[in-house]
Amino acid sequence: MSAQQLSDLIRFARHNSPYYRDLYASLPPDAGRLTDLPVVDQVSFWAANAPHDSRVLTGPLSEATVYKTGGTTGSPKFSVYTRDEWRTFVTAFGQGLVDTGLRPGHRVADLFYAGELYASFLFILDSLAHAPVDNVRLPIGGGAPLESTIPTLRDLAAQVLAGTPTTLCRLAEQVLASGVRLGSVELLLFGGEALFEDQRRLLATAFPGAEARSVGYASVDAGLLGRPVPGADARVHRAFTPYSVVEILDDSTDEPITEPGRPGRVVVTSLFRRLMPIIRYPAGDRAEWTGTGPGHFRILGRAEEGVRVGPVSLYTQDAQDAVASADTAGQVVGMQLVVRRWEGRDGLVLRLATAPGDERAGELTGGPAAERRAALARAVVAELETVRPLYPDSVRAGFVHPLSVEWARHRDLAVNPRTGKLVRVLDERPTA
């Protein structure tokens, strides 16, 4: 399926999708520019896109592949692609793989995850199959035991390893522990989460002849986001023109940012998806234009709509729902998600503010109030782990630190200095 004109896509979505029809109800009939349109609210979007009787889809779900987005069970979010849309998706992404350093004849191990409606393994495998250069694909998967993965990589002389940073680092640790040398590996393609400096050092030790680069920037819900830009900064990508339009919007006003170096949130419009239109959809990341080339931008981390902790994706709504379910007494009046990185792993802290007048909000030094807060903290963590079971699974696997709760007074919660609005997610990890 080829990309379509934006104005045609808007008209089609308005006419055939009940969700977009309602969203654009107050707009003039000829609204045909992105700036004419509101930004999609993720909560209402996914509430409307139920597995049955979706109000987002423009037609019946009779020919498509269904994928799950959000990374877990609980309240699953489903993203659908027709066969033509998927072909366009993987062909465009496959073209971008050349920018990563993929060369003719490269033997590429796909170490992303498969099954349970997850897309990453199939997506990378299909993108490699549609790449404009010949390559040899090794569909190993991220769930295969490292004890068998390493001999397979050695015996088949794999030259490129593609996977999440977490998977690549676990492999690197096993390589170093076993003393095996995978001398043929020359390229490490990472995706799905940020690659930090401590991880780069580990990968360089295990694979001294390999360079780590971004495999590209995409998601199963938002679609095509960024094609890799060769260079020293793996965070820099460029838009997949003409298949998608990337905007960077001001955090306070939602006005498009045009000048380099000014951070904002990433919003994407897919020009090739018609069954499940994606128009001004928040990708969940923050970025800034670099000014180094047309459409070049640097990814800066996750935005408020979502957060990535190691291999786990969470939405702020997940944490809010967990607090609402556990806090039957209404003790919590504010919440922030704080993502930190220490000892080589990511960790998520739930910063909870108690009701005004609780002068001991930041203390847990005994007494009935402290006991109630401790019990509430355990209940909130249990609720969130139930909704996002991949998190405790990742804790047990050693990928991330356990969830924790940090108590605060409401005035201690970080706010936007320009608007006074609460900042839902604080990403305190290094950006490079």
Task: Locate the predicted segments by residue.
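Nucleotide 5′-phosphate-binding alpha/beta core
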Residues: 1-68, 74-91, 95-99, 349, ...
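Generic structural signal for residues in well-ordered beta-strands
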Residues: 135-137, 212-213, 246, 335, ...
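A short, hydrophobic beta-strand element of the alpha/beta-hydrolase
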Residues: 189-190, 216
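AMP-binding/adenylate-forming catalytic core of the ANL superfamily
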Residues: 161, 267, 272-395, 420
